[in-house]
Amino acid sequence: MRYVAAYLLAALSGNADPSTADIEKILSSVGIECNPSQLQKVMNELKGKDLEALIAEGQTKLASMPTGGAPAAAAGGAATAPAAEAKEAKKEEKKEESEEEDEDMGFGLFD
């Protein structure tokens, strides 16, 4: 991902065909070390491709991927409803108790 981001940064700044040295310079400017074999692989994959088309293709691929928590929450929603109601009732009871404690402001020590 870091190599793709550096490549896009170089390309969007006006360098139509960034070299590996350009990418290494960008990454080293922020303290990131380069793995030459991974960088070369990314460069070979991106060479000669239209960046806007790649971005559009990536967006469609990301849109088709399922999100992490949504299916599990939808499936277990009906089963957790009674538990949620019980938690709310317990919270209300605790809240009422704490309000009573606040009213005496600590003067109930000698009652």
Curated annotation (Swiss-Prot):
<protein>
    <recommendedName>
        <fullName>Large ribosomal subunit protein P2</fullName>
    </recommendedName>
</protein>
<dbReference type="Pfam" id="PF00428">
    <property type="entry name" value="Ribosomal_60s"/>
</dbReference>
<dbReference type="InterPro" id="IPR027534">
    <property type="entry name" value="Ribosomal_P1/P2"/>
</dbReference>
<feature type="compositionally biased region" description="Low complexity">
    <location>
        <begin position="63"/>
        <end position="84"/>
    </location>
</feature>
<comment type="subunit">
    <text>Part of the ribosomal stalk of the large ribosomal subunit; P1 and P2 exist as dimers which assemble on the P0 scaffold.</text>
</comment>
<keyword id="KW-0687">Ribonucleoprotein</keyword>
<dbReference type="GO" id="GO:0003735">
    <property type="term" value="F:structural constituent of ribosome"/>
</dbReference>
<comment type="function">
    <text>Plays an important role in the elongation step of protein synthesis.</text>
</comment>
<dbReference type="InterPro" id="IPR044076">
    <property type="entry name" value="Ribosomal_P2"/>
</dbReference>
<feature type="region of interest" description="Disordered">
    <location>
        <begin position="63"/>
        <end position="111"/>
    </location>
</feature>
<comment type="similarity">
    <text>Belongs to the eukaryotic ribosomal protein P1/P2 family.</text>
</comment>
<dbReference type="GO" id="GO:0002182">
    <property type="term" value="P:cytoplasmic translational elongation"/>
</dbReference>
<feature type="modified residue" description="Phosphoserine">
    <location>
        <position position="98"/>
    </location>
</feature>
<keyword id="KW-0597">Phosphoprotein</keyword>
<keyword id="KW-0689">Ribosomal protein</keyword>
<feature type="compositionally biased region" description="Basic and acidic residues">
    <location>
        <begin position="85"/>
        <end position="97"/>
    </location>
</feature>
<dbReference type="InterPro" id="IPR001859">
    <property type="entry name" value="Ribosomal_P1/P2_euk"/>
</dbReference>
<dbReference type="InterPro" id="IPR038716">
    <property type="entry name" value="P1/P2_N_sf"/>
</dbReference>
<dbReference type="GO" id="GO:0022625">
    <property type="term" value="C:cytosolic large ribosomal subunit"/>
</dbReference>
